[in-house]
């Protein structure tokens, strides 16, 4: 009887050990990280550097697959339909989960079909005055916009972008009306901003850095978790008592829903080690990116809150996709 009990215990221990081993990420399969944007942008750079570090640290075969289309919805849907075995991951900003589904029908339910794993980087958004707007600071902008409703034209990378939704939230919070001018990307907005066609630019901060340095543009505030090292004098919107308008591109890793807790924890641990790696930290510094905003439930809660608040802002302002 004792022999049978010991044998059963041994078999159980072996089974448990096998199960625990199966929970380790990355496992035997190659890992495909889908980036739902064209090559060359911030997400692509983050994905490739993160992939390089993960290869070195875990021995995994990491493949970066750019799959743009449908406002980043195409690549996002591919991951949402994948098996939750850790072999297919999404690297994207939170926008395909928290903004896009409120603008158009998607084939995935962002709150049901995808699991936030970790925020890996933040791309700050800058609110910058052009030569066409004579104000000294953010308070001056709001005062002018209140006294001259719709007179201030602000250029963004496009309708339904983080910058657009963030400015809608800002205008609602400050009762300052301004006119949105959507462009097709940061570069087009910058060109018109430098030419004085618009009074204000709301674009990724790295796009305007040289023009701020030359004096052609003046930063009034940043949408970011913390101040930019290159602009230590420029406040964040949270510091200006406008946390509800604190919008920025929060890049994260997402997995198909249904991943086991053990596998999720193993993946999160691998990502945390990779983000602490000097090579990855070097990319953040040189690209003027900030560290991610959280891992696991911390990040998941942020995504849920964004999804809910964006639904209200987009509906209240009748924001449409391009």
Task: State what each model feature region is.
Residues 22-112, 151, 175-200, 211, ...:
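N-terminal (or domain-start) structured segment
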Residues 27-30, 239, 261-322:
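An extracytoplasmic/periplasmic, membrane-proximal ligand-sensing/linker region
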Residues 1-5:
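Positively charged n-region of N-terminal signal peptides that target proteins for export
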Residues 8-17:
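Bacterial N-terminal signal peptides
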Residues 42, 46, 50, 75, ...:
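Stable alpha-helical elements in mature extracytoplasmic
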């Amino acid at each position: 009887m004792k022999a049978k009990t010991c044998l059963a215990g041994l078999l159980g221990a072996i089974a448990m050990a096998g199960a625990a081993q199966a929970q380790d990420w990355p496992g035997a399969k190659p890992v495909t990280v889908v980036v739902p944007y064209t090559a060359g942008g911030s997400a692509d750079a983050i994905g490739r550097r993160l992939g390089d570090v993960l290869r070195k640290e875990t021995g995994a075969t990491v493949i970066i697959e750019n799959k743009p289309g449908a406002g980043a919805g195409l690549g996002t849907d591919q991951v949402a339909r994948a098996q939750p075995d850790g072999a297919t991951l999404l690297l994207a900003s939170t926008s395909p989960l928290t903004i896009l589904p409120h603008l158009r029908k998607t084939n995935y339910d962002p709150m049901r079909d995808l699991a936030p794993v970790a925020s890996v980087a933040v791309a700050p958004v800058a609110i910058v005055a052009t030569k066409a707007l004579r104000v000294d600071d953010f308070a001056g902008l709001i005062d002018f916009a209140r006294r001259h409703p719709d007179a201030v034209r602000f250029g963004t990378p496009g309708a339904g972008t983080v910058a657009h939704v963030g400015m809608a939230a800002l205008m609602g919070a400050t009762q300052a009306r301004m006119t949105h001018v959507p462009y097709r990307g940061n570069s087009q907005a910058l060109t018109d901003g430098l030419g004085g066609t618009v009074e204000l630019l709301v674009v990724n901060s790295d796009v305007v850095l040289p023009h701020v340095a030359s004096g052609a543009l003046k930063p009034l505030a940043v949408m970011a978790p913390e101040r930019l090292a290159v602009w230590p004098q420029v406040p964040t919107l949270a510091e200006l008592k406008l946390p509800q308008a604190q919008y920025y591109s929060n890049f994260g890793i997402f997995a198909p829903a249904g991943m086991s807790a053990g596998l999720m924890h193993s993946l999160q641990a691998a990502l945390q080690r990779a983000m602490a790696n000097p090579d990855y930290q070097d990319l953040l510094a040189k690209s003027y990116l900030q560290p991610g905003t959280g891992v696991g439930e911390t990040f998941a809660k942020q995504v849920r809150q964004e999804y809910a608040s964006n639904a209200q802002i987009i509906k209240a302002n009748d924001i449409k996709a391009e």
